[in-house]
């Protein structure tokens, strides 16, 4: 898990943004790329470079592989409505993301771990698939045996993140009701995520 967190911070540094809005992210104090020539700063990106960087930000923020993000985009593209909103709605509906957004864990990586270890239920039933799609009205809850885990307690006590409006969180019960599928403009991203550039990247 430590290795995953270190890779996460390297991603923030490489992209030049504090992706998760955490105070301990090194990009907050060293806003330049890592490596021998990192202090020279970030290069000006081409149009494609900006699209690729936006794609990388989404992939890192949601802890997904390129294949997973591509497949999610294709489903969003084939649905009616705005493709960017469809994409963000699908990403925010992932079970691990709901657990993270509700503030029950400090990172989306630990949310994936919590789900995989069968510590999370949806409507009272254990679900151990991080990519499981939560539907409006579903109740996601941390199982009692996991409510005292240090990472859960630390995340709940932290004030670093704001719970989005599409979730109704009961901190005492360690539960969150998924009220609706959010649009891009409704998600309180700590960084500028530029979903329009992601759509352009996949559409090019």
From Swiss-Prot:
Residue ranges of every copy of the S4 RNA-binding domain listed in the record: 93-156
PROSITE patterns: RIBOSOMAL_S4 (PS00632), S4 (PS50889)
Ribonucleoprotein in keyword set: yes
Residue stretches spanning the membrane: none
Molecular-function GO terms, alphabetical: rRNA binding; structural constituent of ribosome
Any GO BP annotation: ribosomal small subunit biogenesis
Record's keyword annotation contains rRNA-binding: yes
CDD domains xref list: S4
Example of a GO cellular component annotation carried by this entry: small ribosomal subunit
Chain coiled-coil ranges: none
Keyword terms: Ribonucleoprotein, Ribosomal protein, RNA-binding, rRNA-binding
Top-level taxon of origin: Bacteria
Subunit text: Part of the 30S ribosomal subunit. Contacts protein S5. The interaction surface between S4 and S5 is involved in control of translational fidelity.
Function according to Swiss-Prot or TrEMBL: One of the primary rRNA binding proteins, it binds directly to 16S rRNA where it nucleates assembly of the body of the 30S subunit. With S5 and S12 plays an important role in translational accuracy.
Record-stated family: Belongs to the universal ribosomal protein uS4 family.
Cross-referenced PANTHER family: 30S 40S RIBOSOMAL PROTEIN, SMALL RIBOSOMAL SUBUNIT PROTEIN US4M
HAMAP family associated with the record: Ribosomal_uS4_B (MF_01306_B)
Descriptive protein name: Small ribosomal subunit protein uS4
Organism: Anaplasma marginale (strain St. Maries)
GN (gene name): rpsD
